[in-house]
């Protein structure tokens, strides 16, 4: 293992241990040995998550005039997941271990070296038999006896009680096979030969209602976005918004991830924060504004304009989301991956992944996709309920087009349609058929007819972020260690969590200098009562003041307020009712009047 990899593991271990020690994140069901890929947020974690949620909600909905919120259910009619494509295609390619049936993601098998050992089967004195051949990789450096023991143990745990005692299982007709280098055909943990790659759907199934037949199957939502599409018309009709506008939602999502890993980064239950921002198709913008503004380097993205096409809107949201991350202290650890045409889904026009530096590598934090009208159109077809909106301005502008202008637009759409058919067929590795072209021609003509009458299915830009990944990203970014010499001259490593004040779970620690001085305690409780109505504070009177600062540094608290004898007026009237305000990151300490505290702190933490 490389030094970098070892350091990354060590860093993650420290972060996981801090999260448990200070009550940020616990393993779910820990007293029962845990529950794979599921995590619980402790008192500090719950506050941190709530702050992140609030920053997202405020920035994305409340502070904007063009985005509304939604809070939809986790369980929905399974027809939604059929229409969205999740039932048929939301799958990872998996390979199964022939020894244990344990699955592994096909693209997660690291190459291994070793010798193949073959057995015709196994039996035990209980009469139990395994009547099929098995092949296992004896890894380079592994002793044959330890391989046999491993195989017996795996067989026994798969067979259950019937196989009897592990040590009494007999492996039959052992034969040495090929020596392999960099093989990816054996399970990385068990060493058992892997079967062919097969798709494995990531949706978690459940049954709705008292009977548990196939007709009652539904799914825990694997993303929050589909509810936004399914409720698009209700929100549109009830809010009197005009396109362009967006609908944002925060909520739980579930994916039966095959290999949940890297702490909360890849979980089976997690929270998403998604925005579907609905825009006019470029053709509608062109008819209304005469020309569509497309993106070029240096384009002004500060304020949306009526002539923006999808490209500008996509770039705008990448810019907005970048500003969001800057506002929570992640600005300098972001990278962008623009998906190539080969990466893109056939309906997507562009997609950028916002990546973040984690100890285990630079990984996706958020995806921002321009998805055309794929989602609303899919629901329109499947539900047979129109998802079109009527745009008076478009109708008026279209009425002024000449017949030639309309024909030219139609011809352009037909050409685009033919190219889409070819591209889709190419992705599916087949020849496009005459029927494909005929269907596309019909659909393009329909689109133009409806457009000229002022109707269209809105297109969408989708910034989709994960709350748990964001929480982990801010913790990982904030984690730092410094060496300190304590009061007795002993060196110790102090952990300081340099969380941005906006997301820090506790904003201010309030400390009376001494706990046995009633006047200090009374004043400190007064300050605590004043602040806690406006922000999450922590009152602490135990241990030395240095220890108390250190405890709050480790919890990520950005400010500390100490109430001392000066506060009580013992060193003259000019310092009476002032406190020491300590800034975690700069170490600066300043004297502030109690009456000025709130005004000073509020802008820093919100
Ligand atoms: P990945 O490629 O990492 O599996 P994805 O591209 O499938 O992610 P999306 O479907 O685009 O992810 O989901 C949007 C966001 O939801 C992701 O950027 C991520 O922040 C979050 N997310 C997705 N899957 C998980 C998961 N298993 N655990 C935690 N967060 C997740």
Regions found by a protein language model. Give the residues of each.
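NTP/phosphate- and nucleic-acid-binding module
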Residues: 1-606
